[in-house]
């Protein structure tokens, strides 16, 4: 018996009328592997509590009888819950009208670029930073412009302001804490970027709950026509599988997104599950302090083993300097530890996990330190993200 055929398998991308600016590109692809220690995608390693699982299950059961109807198109109840959470977490009063939600923060970023980017428009980011910013920009036919960070991955605010003045981007991305380096931007520096920017400034606060830096939300009243703060429930909130991202901005920004969002984009199941997760916010976020303490412990032990560790305000560490980062990544994997090669020469990124996971990561790191690290202190190359 012949093997089953796959209809249409005889063609490839080159045979399709793909847009020219997408040819040769690669999709986002963090490895998803089953290994003993998974420290590569910056999730909260603590699973949801039984109380949260039960609440999610009951909440979904309650709405299941209405699955034949479309969900609340504007997710008003969920947005109200998010506004209440933000008001408590940041100490800044936030109203339902300031909040918008979508399927993960990547959909939030996509909607923002649909509204404020597009053909003939330009987006700028300070690299190395979150790899989805250029991918989403180019996917919406927005010109992507890179501005470099310092050799130590910090942001040179004078250079940043000068680059914005020169390139005049329609959208500026500022990630704080920055992924994959971990730096947070001080409020005074962010204000300088907002003053210089001619268009929208998106402050990506995916890891904000881990940071000691005040949220950029406090600047919205001062820059209502420019500032958008993007957040997610995938990191500190331990809700990565639930796929819920949101933003905070002036109500007019939400009105703009209503022009480009798909109707009924948030399912009734997603809305119910996210609201249940928000009811358990205090319990879930109690792990943040513990993860921050683990981060500091891991950073200190890596440094003691001879690694250079970039100071981090998030739940991950960028560290090196490896003679061959892809080879070192594979050796970690061979030992059952999955971390992330983010494409920065000489460096790898590790998520902070549970204490036992961190112990195993550190054990393997000590093994690799003997023959994988560069000893030449003069090479400060940062490469590209």
Swiss-Prot record:
Protein name as it appears in the record: Histidinol-phosphate aminotransferase
Record-linked InterPro entries: Aminotrans_II_pyridoxalP_BS (IPR001917), Aminotransferase_I/II_large (IPR004839), HisP_aminotrans (IPR005861), PyrdxlP-dep_Trfase (IPR015424), PyrdxlP-dep_Trfase_major (IPR015421), PyrdxlP-dep_Trfase_small (IPR015422)
Domain of life: Bacteria
Cofactor(s), by name: pyridoxal 5'-phosphate
Pathway linked to the protein: Amino-acid biosynthesis; L-histidine biosynthesis; L-histidine from 5-phospho-alpha-D-ribose 1-diphosphate: step 7/9
GO terms classed as biological process: L-histidine biosynthetic process
Secretion signal span: none
Keywords: Amino-acid biosynthesis, Aminotransferase, Histidine biosynthesis, Pyridoxal phosphate, Transferase
Disulphide bond pairs: none
Taxonomy of the source species: Bacteria, Bacillati, Actinomycetota, Actinomycetes, Mycobacteriales
Gene name in the database record: hisC
């Amino acid at each position: 018996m012949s093997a089953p055929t796959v209809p249409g398998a005889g063609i490839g991308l080159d045979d399709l009328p793909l847009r020219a600016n997408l040819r040769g590109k690669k999709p986002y692809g963090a490895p998803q592997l089953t290994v003993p220690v998974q420290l590569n995608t910056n999730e909260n390693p603590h699973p949801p509590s039984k109380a949260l699982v039960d609440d999610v299950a009951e909440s979904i059961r309650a709405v299941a009888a209405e699955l034949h109807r479309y969900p609340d198109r504007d997710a008003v109840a969920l947005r109200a819950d998010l506004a209440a959470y933000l008001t408590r977490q940041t100490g800044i009063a936030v109203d339902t009208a300031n909040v918008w939600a979508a399927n993960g923060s990547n959909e939030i970023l996509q909607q923002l670029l649909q509204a404020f980017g597009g053909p003939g428009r330009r987006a700028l980011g300070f690299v190395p930073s979150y790899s989805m910013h250029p991918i989403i920009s180019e996917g919406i036919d927005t010109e992507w412009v890179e501005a470099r960070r310092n050799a130590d991955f910090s942001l040179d605010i004078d250079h940043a302001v000068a680059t914005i003045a020169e390139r005049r981007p329609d959208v500026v991305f500022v990630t704080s804490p920055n992924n994959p380096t971990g730096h947070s931007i001080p409020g005074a520096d962010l204000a300088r970027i907002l003053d210089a920017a001619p268009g929208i400034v998106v402050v990506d606060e995916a890891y904000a709950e881990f940071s000691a830096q005040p949220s950029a939300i406090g600047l919205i009243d001062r820059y209502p026509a420019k500032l958008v703060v993007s957040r997610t429930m995938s990191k500190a909130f331990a809700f990565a599988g639930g796929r819920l991202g949101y933003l905070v901005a002036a109500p007019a920004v939400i009105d703009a997104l209503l022009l480009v969002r798909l109707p009924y984009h948030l399912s009734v199941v997603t809305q119910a599950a996210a609201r249940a997760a928000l009811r358990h916010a205090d319990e879930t976020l109690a792990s943040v302090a513990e993860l921050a303490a683990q981060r500091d412990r891991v950073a200190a032990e890596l440094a003691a083993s001879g690694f250079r560790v970039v100071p981090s305000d998030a739940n991950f560490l960028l560290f090196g300097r490896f003679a061959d980062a892809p080879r070192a990544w594979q050796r970690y994997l061979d030992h059952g530890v999955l971390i992330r090669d983010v494409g920065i020469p000489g460096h790898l990124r590790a998520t902070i996990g549970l204490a036992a996971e961190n112990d195993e990561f550190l054990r393997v790191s000590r093994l690799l330190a003997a023959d994988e690290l560069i000893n030449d202190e003069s090479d400060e190359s940062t490469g590209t993200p």
